[in-house]
Regions:
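Anionic coordination/interaction segments
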Residues: 1-127, 131-141, 145, 151, ...
């Protein structure tokens, strides 16, 4: 595992990402690269029944509570994968393009936002491990002034690109906390909107955006829906 996997702005713990991404110096949309050894381990993890159930529970929760936004994620990822068959989803039928495993042994995040994710999009956070959630490991949403007990096995969806979040420390060195984080980089949607090319290539070819930034944001917020719409869609 490289130095960047254990020293990063989100916390003092090992973390490894897998999936489809664009940004951070990439020239085009692609699969995150790993050594053959790490790739084999990640493949085994992603193919395990337990991990597939955990990941797809988060995906199905996303579909249930944010159906329009989920469709946008899923349709964009489908378009990317159809255009480039080399792209590989982490989990079949899952709308999230990428996942990060926070490996701990005490994965306690610093205050941060995931500013490269889709601004109005959702990030699924699932806590794992063995710790007392009444005494530590809480999820803190700073902008909402909320401290949430977050036991192992809990999943939450938050707009992590714009909402500052972190974790409370664990109280015992014998406790362990890990996490599965699922998300999609904003650059993927920008790439698709630019006709599956970079913004620079799009503009050089005389491309004109169908919407202004303000219009795009309004459209994005409209995908979140409201409580009355959620109730009306359920029996």
């Amino acid at each position: 595992m490289s130095k960047s996997h254990v020293q990063h702005r989100r916390g003092n713990f090992a973390a490894v990402a897998s999936g489809i991404s664009f940004g951070g110096g990439q020239q085009r949309v692609g699969n995150l690269a790993h050594s053959p050894y790490n790739a084999a381990i990640l493949d085994a993890v992603k193919q395990s029944t337990a991990m597939r159930r955990i990941a797809n529970f988060a995906n199905n929760s996303f579909r249930l509570f944010f159906s329009k936004l989920h469709h946008f994620y899923d349709a964009t990822l489908d378009a990317l994968c159809s255009r480039d068959p080399s792209l590989q989803r982490n989990f079949t039928g899952n709308a999230f393009a990428c996942a990060t495993w926070n490996l701990g042994p005490q994965a306690i995040s610093y205050v941060h936002t995931d500013h490269l994710n889709l601004p109005w999009g959702m990030c699924a956070i699932t806590a794992l491990g063995d710790f007392d959630p009444t005494r530590g490991g809480h999820l803190i949403l700073w902008d909402l002034h909320l401290i949430i007990e977050f036991p192992p096995g809990t999943t939450i969806l938050i707009p992590s690109a714009i909402l500052r979040h972190s974790n409370a420390p664990l109280v015992s060195p014998n406790e362990h906390r890990y996490a599965l984080i699922q998300y999609s980089a904003g650059g993927l949607f920008r790439w698709a909107e630019c006709g599956h090319q970079t913004q620079k290539q799009f503009r050089s070819a005389g491309g004109v955006y169908a919407q202004t930034g303000r219009q795009r944001w309004k459209r994005g917020v409209g995908m979140l829906g409201i409580w009355d719409e959620l109730k009306a869609s359920r029996p």
